[in-house]
UniProtKB/Swiss-Prot annotation:
Highest rank taxon of the organism: Eukaryota
Cystine connections: C3-C24, C6-C11, C17-C41, C45-C57, C58-C63
Record-given protein name: Frontoxin IV
Similarity annotation: Belongs to the three-finger toxin family. Ancestral subfamily.
Function (record text): Produces peripheral paralysis by blocking neuromuscular transmission at the postsynaptic site. Binds to the muscular nicotinic acetylcholine receptor (nAChR).
Tissue expression: Expressed by the venom gland.
Organism per entry: Micrurus frontalis (Coral snake)
SUPFAM superfamilies named in the record: Snake toxin-like
Length: 64
């Protein structure tokens, strides 16, 4: 499984996920200046926190 890893809306960078981390995720939030994006691989979908504007979890290569 590969997941995108860059903190931009358009993302070309991917990484192979370690064994057991078969979920790609993307979190978005605003830091009062711009929209921030975090992407990567996880074993379990992270929790949506109050400051997040969106949370995506998926199980296909580069789906985040």
């Amino acid at each position: 499984m590969t997941c995108k890893t860059c903190p931009f809306e358009t993302c070309a960078n991917s990484e192979y996920c370690p064994a057991g981390n078969d979920i790609c995720y993307q979190k978005k939030w605003n830091d009062h200046r711009e929209e921030m994006i975090e992407r990567g691989c996880v074993a379990n979908c992270p929790q949506m926190e109050s400051h997040h504007t969106s949370l995506l979890c998926c199980r296909r290569d580069n789906c985040n």
